[in-house]
Amino acid sequence: MTTVAVKPATMAQALTRAMRDAMAADPTVHVMGEDVGTLGGVFRVTDGLAKEFGEDRCTDTPLAEAGILGAAVGMAMYGLRPVVEMQFDAFAYPAFEQLVSHVSRMRNRTRGRMPLPITVRIPYGGGIGGVEHHSDSSEAYYMATPGLHVVTPATVADAYGLLRQAIASDDPVVFLEPKRLYWSKDSWNPEQPTDVEPIGRAVVRRTGRSATLITYGPSLPVCMEAAEAAQAEGWDLEVVDLRSLVPFDDETVCASIRRTGRAVVVHESTGFGGPGGEIAARVTERCFHHLEAPVLRVAGFDIPYPPPMLERHHLPGVDRILDAVARLQWEAEG
């Protein structure tokens, strides 16, 4: 029996491999964006694709995000599967008109006759000390746009598996890539890289009985660290990685709440108007009789991303998460 080596790989490498394998398997897959070809992308996630598949299939575009996504709409209507890279999270805002008015609506507009298999890759979140427009958490905008799937991996295996699923989907997918996890490493089997749960399914990363931390993307490692630290206080925390914000896995989340009776939602986006409000509402509506305390949120503050020297104070950290868990215990005890 042959043993397949499991070796450390970064999330960036897994994403590159996902696009390479998709392009090799399907000639209709085209990668496009600013500097994705010759440079290989700002984060080098498309490195080598232009050399391997040619500039016709890995194409450098002008610095015009609305034009990039508008071209992708035409390509998808023609029968291609464009994979669009928006260089940074806030750079995607000029393309909102295309995304909201056309990408998200085309299947409904044509009564299902014309799907748009577009994957929009967006590096997002903080953690790299980026200046204005280079760090943002914009997932709530996409969640509020019917017709879009919104996916964000937090592990190397999910980076590969979810991106392959997104590219193969006939629905448009906003694929949010946590910038600060690009260089995170994990053991990964390159010969069985698609062995992950499908889009729309959450995963319990750590089991527990005291409370549930509901999170996704860049906040998963922080929640795992907080769960380990909580053991010293006698708290046994469960951690649920959503992986997909749309579709949302109510079943897995509510099953966790039934076990723990308490929940904290953790994300980098703002508290007011952020994803945590929707998640807390869904938990309350579906699991109310299992809750022993109100659902709490630990989020970025309601301000634009601060300058690099203040960023660590803005992002949810272990101390803020443990404070929320302590409040849950106090609320439950009356």
What kind of feature is each model-predicted range?
Residues M1-L176, L181, H313, W330, ...:
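Thiamine diphosphate
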